[in-house]
Amino acid sequence: MNLSKSILLLFLATPVLAQENSQEFQYRVEMSGTVSTGTYAPLWLTANRFGMESEKPKSGYLRAGLEWHKPLRKGWRIDAGLDLAGGVKQTSDFWIQQAYADFSWKMLTLSVGSKERMGFPLEKNSELTSGWMAEGPNMRPIPQIRGEIKDYLSIPGTRQWLAFKGHLAYGIFTDGHWQEDFCGVNQKYAKKVMYHSKSLMFRLGNKEKLPVEFEFGLFMATQFSGDQYQKLADGSSKQITDMPDGLKSYWHAFFPTAGGSDTPEGEQVNVEGNMLGSWNFGLNFYAGDWKIRATLDHYFEDHSQMFWEYGRWKDGQLGIEVYLPKNKWVSAVLWEGISTKDSSGPILYDGFWGSFSDLQMSGGDDYYNHYIYQAWQHYGQGIGNPLLAGPVYNQDGSICFKSNRMKAQHVGISGNPSEEWKWRLIASYARHWGRYSSPLDKVRKQFNGMAEVTYLPQWAKGWSVSAALGIDRGNYLGNSTGGMITLRKTGGLGK
């Protein structure tokens, strides 16, 4: 609770700068319940909801949050929030979903704490997309200290033809105790793991002069430091690996570098920690009230797929978004094709572990998995695209992605018939091959679909209710049919 106390103090703190008179408190109270058949709830009733929804067929939660917004003089601003939640059949009975303070000057922000952040820096339709390949909204927020320019900032002298945005963050994974409880006998888990991410994205174009924009950039993230344990038959654990946690490790995370003699051999010939990322590209075309956007989200692990070392890129997510002029029927349409099947090929050979010391083959990337940190996950949910089901779905207590070689098609469509009503439909079809090291017994297929309607009554300002129907059919996660109802109340507490 120390973090929440710190946030409360920030509410009461008086900045050195002279203040404006206006300030605003906003509250949010929300409750949600899910009931379904099958072993698991339908995927799209769970995924991309910041870890708030459980994979279990019957679950629910209640959350309450308060935000404070304070504009100051000379372009300064403070935003802070505290969001608490409790649930039934969740990974925790009670948890702090958000506790943060943002200090902003013009377009530059220093954010401290745990905060729900949409995928960055590549923008996608958050209501319709299947997710982001490297990091998205599929898991609970990771507490961090983060400097960022969230929106594109024009570079002086370019007449607004060139702009950039980006971020730099260090944080800590808070799911160590969850991993220990979830982990099965003889399985491995990690605690006290640190987090690092950074991004830089450019936009070329000025839509006021030419109706075309091109975006390109890079996102990188790393798990580093921490300790690895193995669960024993008597319920105790033994430490297997003690990763370094000094200042040098923070530098190695920022600038991917081979580890020293205090790291396992695998880190000494590759890079220290679990380094991953994505190349991001976007192409926008504007025609009157129409907008067409194409995106490419290319995922990589270490260096093998970062460039064209093993041929042209075969893995990633290709997307097309179409935004229609305002009408009563359809607002947006989306299609995405996703592939993680190649993974740089099946061969991983580190010469120091074999007979040919001068031979190095860096294939078999084993996406989202790692031999020290187990998996790119937080509280059991994958940090990347949720069509690759996270460790929370593993009934044997293993913290890994059992199928990270997949091909999928995903579609979405949404509409806003009026100010009171909105709806969306999303559907995915995926084929799973398992892992190179442990392939599935056969190619397994899975369909995941969801229809959701939200009502925002004008006669009850601040209230909304959402009803969703989810349907899963297949032989990977199995069959499931279920519904979810979410009731929400938001409002202000004065200025």
Locations of the language-model features?
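Bacterial Sec-dependent N-terminal signal peptides
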Residues: 1-24, 493-495
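One-face residue pattern on beta-strands with alternating periodicity enriched for small/polar residues
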Residues: 61-67, 81-83, 100-102, 109-113, ...
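Internal, well-ordered domain-core segments that constitute the primary functional module
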Residues: 118-234
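Extracytoplasmic loops and strand-loop junctions of Gram-negative outer membrane beta-barrel proteins
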Residues: 46-50, 83, 127-131, 181-186, ...
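Short loop/turn motifs that connect adjacent beta-strands in outer-membrane beta-barrel proteins
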Residues: 19-26, 68-79, 104-107, 152-166, ...
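Beta-barrel outer-membrane channel/assembly domains of diderm bacteria
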Residues: 18-117, 127, 135, 141-152, ...
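Sequence/structural signature of outer-membrane beta-barrel proteins
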Residues: 36-38, 83-89, 115-133, 154, ...
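Exposed, low-structure sequence patches enriched in small/polar residues
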Residues: 212-221, 227-495
